Swiss-Prot record:
This protein's record includes keyword Metal-binding: no
PANTHER family according to UniProt: 50S RIBOSOMAL PROTEIN L32, LARGE RIBOSOMAL SUBUNIT PROTEIN BL32
A Gene Ontology molecular function term of the record: structural constituent of ribosome
Protein name: Large ribosomal subunit protein bL32
Native species: Staphylococcus saprophyticus subsp. saprophyticus (strain ATCC 15305 / DSM 20229 / NCIMB 8711 / NCTC 7292 / S-41)
Record key words, sorted: Ribonucleoprotein, Ribosomal protein
Protein family (similarity comment): Belongs to the bacterial ribosomal protein bL32 family.
TM spans (from-to): none
Cellular compartments per GO CC: large ribosomal subunit
GO BP term, example: translation
Length: 57
């Protein structure tokens, strides 16, 4: 079995993980009510998607 010869230091470990991060979700403004919502999803505030009322409130 493969076993590491030396312990991985904190610096080396953190340098390897520099690209391992969470990206910010794409938020857009709803054209109906002006609230911020996730792209390509129904607005939680007014229930519209692409200018049409999808969810009745």
């Amino acid at each position: 079995m493969a076993v590491p010869k030396r312990r991985t230091s904190k610096t080396r470990k953190n340098k390897r993980r520099t690209h391992f991060k969470i990206s910010v979700p794409g938020m857009t403004e709803c054209p109906n009510c002006g609230e911020y919502k996730l792209s390509h999803r129904v607005c939680k505030n007014c229930g519209s998607y692409k200018g049409e009322d999808v969810v009745s409130k």
